[in-house]
Curated annotation (Swiss-Prot):
Protein name, as recorded: L-prolyl-[peptidyl-carrier protein] dehydrogenase
A GO MF term: flavin adenine dinucleotide binding
InterPro entries per record: Acyl-CoA_Oxase/DH_mid-dom (IPR006091), Acyl-CoA_Oxase/DH_mid-dom_sf (IPR046373), AcylCo_DH-like_C (IPR036250), AcylCo_DH/oxidase_C (IPR009075), AcylCoA_DH/ox_N (IPR013786), AcylCoA_DH/ox_N_sf (IPR037069), AcylCoA_DH/oxidase_NM_dom_sf (IPR009100)
Assigned keywords, A-Z: Antibiotic biosynthesis, FAD, Flavoprotein, Oxidoreductase
Protein family according to the UniProt entry: Belongs to the acyl-CoA dehydrogenase family.
Catalytic site positions: E244 (proton acceptor)
Organism: Serratia sp. (strain ATCC 39006)
Disruption phenotype: Cells lacking this gene show a white phenotype.
PANTHER family in the record: ACYL-COA DEHYDROGENASE (PTHR43884), ISOVALERYL-COA DEHYDROGENASE, MITOCHONDRIAL-RELATED (PTHR43884:SF12)
């Protein structure tokens, strides 16, 4: 068992980290304080490779596995303070680009995929509804079959990238009586008649990552814009969530690494009672806990992604890593603030903002309560474990 990264994996990480530091982190504080998402930087980052993932070279992708994609995104999280921009990129890749690549028709891939991979188009994934969050298959949006396609009606909320999106991956019921098998996936373009995108909703966290609600009023969707077979939307969504939980979690592992470095540097430099505060056991113990959390998160995430790349069932591993990383990200954020003391309140330092940005990791891509249900099911505690 070799725990070393290969030379190519190390190169992927180091190159992505340098790009994140040198390009995306520049003026990050200004953008964040002004709640601005720079679409220019977003497109540069996508073209660099952060929107490539497993997509084939044919469509401009990098043909990376889940582990290599996670390494790249971890480097992004460590190198750039602009987590809002990074989150937007990851949502675009994991919930839009990857499902289109894995399940879309040749016609859809030829029409959209290269532009999505290279950053010419921005995508949003629309699944969550007012009464369908954790209970996602209770969605009320419908795509009623009609001659030549479908008529879409409904409402989606908390849709990341919606205000800036050029295309939308939509999930709606094509047969309300069939539950999981009654959901289908579609791709629609901005400006489609009947598509209404709401104003940006202000947030206390990830404040420069735009989201809004979207409403569908009698939208005609040609059959050619359906992703996968009719009724395959549940399986497509489930597959995309495996990628999203793994890769978005990697972003927060990168944040843990950055936070540890910042806190360690401060503990060595800050003097109290005639010595560096890191010399005090209460402080050093907190930093040791932060280090332990980081290494645990890396090991669990890397193993989960490796299993996925090997074609093994990694659902429980992905759920466990997402659960662990999100809980640890919040706790380490609190420990960093405790170590910095009053200095942590400095907005320029960004520690309170960092903590706020960590909290959503316990909610998105399935809440931590849902991750525990997944793990319980895989352990045979909720009926079948298949």
């Amino acid at each position: 068992m070799d725990f070393n990264l290969s030379n190519s994996q190390s190169d992927i990480y180091e190159s992505a980290y340098r790009f994140a530091c040198d390009v995306l982190d520049q003026d990050a504080q200004t953008r964040i304080s002004q709640k601005i998402l720079s679409t220019e930087l977003w497109k540069k980052a996508a073209a660099y490779g952060f929107a490539h993932g497993p997509v084939s070279h044919q469509f401009g992708g990098s043909e990376l596995g889940a582990l290599d994609t996670a390494l790249m995104i971890e480097a992004l999280g460590k190198g750039s303070r602009d987590i809002g921009l990074s989150f937007s990129l990851c949502a675009h890749l994991c919930a839009c680009v990857i499902p289109l690549y894995r399940f879309g028709s040749s016609e859809l891939k030829d029409k959209y995929l290269e532009s999505l991979v290279t950053g010419k188009l921005i995508a949003a994934n629309a699944a969550t509804e007012p009464d369908a969050g954790s209970d996602i298959y209770n969605m009320q949006a419908t795509a009623q079959p009609c001659e030549g396609g479908y008529i879409l009606n409904g409402k989606k909320i908390f849709i990341t990238n919606a205000p800036i999106a050029d295309v939308f991956i939509i999930y709606a019921k094509t047969n309300p009586d069939h539950g999981f098998l009654g959901v289908s996936a579609f791709l629609i373009e901005k400006g489609t008649p009947g598509l209404n995108v709401g104003e940006v909703i202000p947030k206390d966290c990830l404040s420069n990552c735009p989201w809004s609600e979207i409403v569908f009023n009698d939208i005609f969707i040609p059959q050619s814009q359906r992703i996968g077979m009719e009724g395959a939307g549940g399986a497509i969504f489930h597959d995309s969530m495996i990628w999203e939980k793994g890769c978005l979690s990697a972003l927060f592992v990168g944040g843990l690494a950055r936070l540890l470095e910042t806190t360690l540097e401060y503990a060595k430099a800050r003097q109290q009672f005639g010595k560096a505060i890191g010399q005090f056991q209460s402080v050093s113990n907190r930093i040791i806990d932060m280090k332990l959390r980081l290494e645990q998160c890396r090991l669990m995430l890397y193993r989960a992604c490796w299993k996925h790349d090997q074609g093994q069932d990694a659902e429980a591993d992905i759920a466990m890593s997402k659960l662990l990383i999100s809980e640890y990200a919040v706790q380490s954020g609190l420990d960093a603030i405790q170590t910095f003391g009053g200095a942590a309140m400095d907005q320029e330092l960004g520690l309170v903002r960092h903590l706020l940005n960590m909290i959503p990791s316990r909610i998105f891509s399935g809440t931590n309560d849902i991750q525990k249900e997944i793990i319980a099911r895989k352990l045979g505690l909720r009926g079948t474990s298949s």
